[in-house]
Amino acid sequence: MSASADSLAAAASLDKYGDEDIFSLLIRYGLYVGALFQFVCISAAVLMENNPDSQSNPETGEVTEREGEPVRTRLHKIRKLEKKKRR
């Protein structure tokens, strides 16, 4: 029993920082809160369903049907505009 008490005293004497101050506690719990916030944001982005009523942005690369214009012509126009932008 005295050997364990002596080893605890020796371990306590090696601890050069002692008790944690308020700043280290603030940093530790702030990191936990930040990790929780990131987890919530990522899970919301993954699990959130798309709203079917929302209008899609035409610049996202999705091709939608237009009246009287075949799909092949639209794809050609999109590729041509992208090539022109790269110049």
Curated annotation (Swiss-Prot):
Membrane topology: Single-pass membrane protein
Record carries keyword Transmembrane helix: yes
Disordered as annotated region, ranges: 50-87
UniProt main location, coarse: membrane
Subcellular location: Membrane
Keyword Ubl conjugation in annotation: no
TM regions (residue ranges): 25-47
CC per GO annotation: membrane
Biased composition (Basic residues): 73-87
InterPro entries, per database record: UPF0239
Annotated keywords: Membrane, Transmembrane, Transmembrane helix
Feature: compositional bias, Basic and acidic residues: 63-72
Record family assignment: Belongs to the UPF0239 family.
Protein name (database record): Protein anon-73B1
Gene name in the database record: anon-73B1
